Amino acid sequence: MNLKKYFIRVLHRLQKGPGYTYKELLVWYCDNTNTHGPKRIIREGPKKKFIWFFLTLLFASLVFWQWGILITTYLSYSVSSSLSIGFKTMKFPAVTVCNASPFKYSKVRHLLRELDELTEAALERILQSKNRDATSALPLNSSETPSQTLNLRLWNQIPLVLIDESDPERPVIIDLFETDESGSGAQPNNSSPALVNVTSEAKKQKVAMKLCSRKALPNCIYRNFTSAAQAVTEWYILQSTSIFAKIPRNETVEMGYQPEDMILACLYGAEPCSYRNFTPIYHPDHGNCYIFNWGKDEEALFSSNPGAEFGLKLILDISQQDYIPYLTSTAGARLMLHEQRSFPFLKDLGIYAMSGTETSIGVLVDELERMGFPYSDCTMNGSDVPVKNLYNEYNTTYSIQACLRSCFQAQMFETCGCGHYLFPLPEGVSYCNSEDDPDWAYCYSSLRSSIGHRQFCIDSCKETCNDIQYKMTISMADWPSEASEEFQYMQHPLTYERDQSRNATLDRNGIIKLNIYFQEYNYRTISESAATTIVWLLSSLGGQFGFWMGGSVLCLIEFGEIIIDFLWITVIKISNWGKGLKQKRARAQYPDAPPTVSELVEAHINL
């Protein structure tokens, strides 16, 4: 019963409202608030009232302005970085070593015979063009041509041309091996894209690759280079890529350098190791590669001391006498330090170790710790990235390099209908080659130079929130020395596991020694933390309010209370106005007063 009476009183109180007018409520607030300023507005004389009203309004505006800046700063989610340096026991990095040449020439010579003959003849033609006018280049059937039996099947797919720019407005294009009249001295079609990579106006002739689309609307682009050697090398790589794309993976592995031939000696700390401690992986750019301490099938190794005596020591034999002449112009080993279970992208992140040297690499580990959403758009494991990671077939962790290449391969398949040889394949896709996909080189070159496709991949891929980078300090010395080279052990295989039946000798042009170790300070941690937190925001808001108006949280509650009272009064006034309007409409519908009881009785009797 008491509870019912209480709710009835509450209902009546709500219907009645605060019991003040707007003016009375405002005067009551100014007289009772703990905020400085409003009290003086109602207690001082007319002049001071105006002054205090102006000051209160000014400082209140300053408070709201400062609050806006603080809230905007907080919502920007800025970060601050901290740096720490020291030495601690850490995982030794995974070390990937490859030969600069992806294959042994002795094992792929039969595949490249036609291409090598074309390359040799093309170089001869280019050399001839240096000594005569470009338009007088000899045709294929000339008696002066030394290569009359060339098979031009590969050449017709992707030819090399000379571009004579004696007249810049009308450049003349000459095929090195002209097979019909349509190509001799032809000028580029107006619909063809402009010649790319023209960097030197002084040179009258340039060597370029002619890449054509053979679809319904034929179109050609010309990729020209600053040097003939560079043009021939890029052309050779493109042609050989098409050839090797048709070879099964198990056969290409057999064509490369085997671990027992390449890794002669291994020592980690004081423990001996061998090629059996390396995990093989096939890399399209460098053939067979071998990873030490990858941590994929075994526990990662740790290092607790700085210096070369506690690191990894390797002796490698690159056998550069078996390099592919036109494919590999660099002799040495390609190596990369990377995190465990991450894929080594040697073409972009690897370094070369020169043959005939002892290369010492001091390692400093950079640990990057980024804040996640909403402070940055990084990803923890790539699960929130819209690009399918094609490198998952290696059971490796996510990286932005893997994402960018997977994105490019997906666009390559979508645009060209096949996949590029340098990247893993999506399911159900085959590698591009000139026989099955005659337009692939044109399509690949167009896609590679497309800014829109490139930007799409950049926008789709995310950086990892936690990343490890290895900074290297590299020093080199000749190895072996002239005196040591005379030692007997330098004239025979350095490992007992090597085939002793072969009369194999080693020379400084094919042998490399590597020392990889942690420096005195082996780690540097760069970590991000939130520059603004909710605690910072509340304290800053309170500080500004207290400084300008002497207020506190209770003052804000008081202000909130009067706002509620204002709204309450407004609702009641609107409600009363609605009731009055309804009554007026009712009176307008029935203008006469209702009859009394006696009038109703009299009317009934008269009936």
UniProtKB/Swiss-Prot annotation:
Residues 72-551 are extracellular. Disulfide bonds join C98-C289, C212-C220, C266-C273, C378-C465, C403-C461, C407-C457, C416-C443, C418-C432. The keyword Translocase does not apply. The keyword Transmembrane applies. Keywords: Cell membrane, Cytoplasmic vesicle, Disulfide bond, Ion channel, Ion transport, Membrane, Sodium, Sodium channel, Sodium transport, Transmembrane, Transmembrane helix, Transport. It comes from the Eukaryota. It catalyses: Na(+)(in) = Na(+)(out). Pfam families: ASC. Residues 1-50, 573-607 are cytoplasmic. One of its GO terms (cellular component) is apical plasma membrane. GO terms for biological process: aldosterone metabolic process; artery smooth muscle contraction; cellular response to acidic pH; cellular response to aldosterone; epithelial fluid transport; erythrocyte homeostasis; gene expression; intracellular sodium ion homeostasis. One of its GO terms (molecular function) is WW domain binding. Gene3D superfamilies: Acid-sensing ion channels like domains, YojJ-like. Originally identified and characterized by its inhibition by the diuretic drug amiloride. It is a multi-pass membrane protein. The chain crosses the membrane at residues 51-71, 552-572. It is found in: Apical cell membrane; Cytoplasmic vesicle membrane. Component of the heterotrimeric epithelial sodium channel (ENaC) composed of an alpha/SCNN1A, a beta/SCNN1B and a gamma/SCNN1G subunit. Belongs to the amiloride-sensitive sodium channel (TC 1.A.6) family. SCNN1B subfamily. This is one of the three pore-forming subunits of the heterotrimeric epithelial sodium channel (ENaC), a critical regulator of sodium balance and fluid homeostasis. ENaC operates in epithelial tissues, where it mediates the electrodiffusion of sodium ions from extracellular fluid through the apical membrane of cells, with water following osmotically. It plays a key role in maintaining sodium homeostasis through electrogenic sodium reabsorption in the kidneys. Additionally, ENaC is essential for airway surface liquid homeostasis, which is crucial for proper mucus clearance. This is Epithelial sodium channel subunit beta. The lineage of its organism: Eukaryota, Metazoa, Chordata, Craniata, Vertebrata.
